[in-house]
Amino acid sequence: MTEWEHVNKVWAVVEPDIPAVGLAILLRLFKEHKETKDLFPKFKEIPVQQLGNNEDLRKHGVTVLRALGNILKQKGKHSTNVKELADTHINKHKIPPKNFVLITNIAVKVLTEMYPSDMTGPMQESFSKVFTVICSDLETLYKEANFQG
């Protein structure tokens, strides 16, 4: 099995829980990297402790994980999906590319905590490798766009 196939095997288990997983990932991101919350105008002024029941944050978590799932399902042939993600984050949201590394690192932690029997050591490595490829592809697109952020 390739890294992509390993990741997709676990992703099939995660998908039914996307609302809870997405919320957990964003909350952890905001707790461990407080500066990232400032990138979200809608949540910027709300204390992290009050975001656990925030419907807008839950919906955004769903959006994030659906986009990620669509990329993962392409098994490395994701250039169109990654380009769309880069375009919105470069031109609309103005999100620096380092934040993709932060959120994917958090995702591995959260998935490991929520799905310990699926997220074995080798599976964590597979996710890390796949996320590194995705983040690298995003960074390339940012450089091509001369992103200044």
Swiss-Prot record:
GO terms for cellular component: extracellular exosome; sarcoplasm. O2 binds at H60. The keyword Translocase does not apply. Its EC number is 1.7.-.-, 1.11.1.-. Residues 2-143 form the Globin domain. Nitrite binds at H60. It catalyses: Fe(III)-heme b-[protein] + nitric oxide + H2O = Fe(II)-heme b-[protein] + nitrite + 2 H(+); H2O2 + AH2 = A + 2 H2O. It is an enzyme of class 1 (oxidoreductase). Heme b binds at H89. SUPFAM superfamilies: Globin-like. One of its GO terms (molecular function) is oxygen carrier activity. GO terms for biological process: removal of superoxide radicals. The modification N-acetylthreonine is found at T2. Coiled coil: none annotated. Keywords: Acetylation, Cytoplasm, Heme, Iron, Metal-binding, Muscle protein, Oxidoreductase, Oxygen transport, Transport. It is found in: Cytoplasm, Sarcoplasm. Monomeric heme protein which primary function is to store oxygen and facilitate its diffusion within muscle tissues. Reversibly binds oxygen through a pentacoordinated heme iron and enables its timely and efficient release as needed during periods of heightened demand. Depending on the oxidative conditions of tissues and cells, and in addition to its ability to bind oxygen, it also has a nitrite reductase activity whereby it regulates the production of bioactive nitric oxide. Monomeric. Belongs to the globin family. This is Myoglobin. It comes from Heterodontus portusjacksoni (Port Jackson shark).
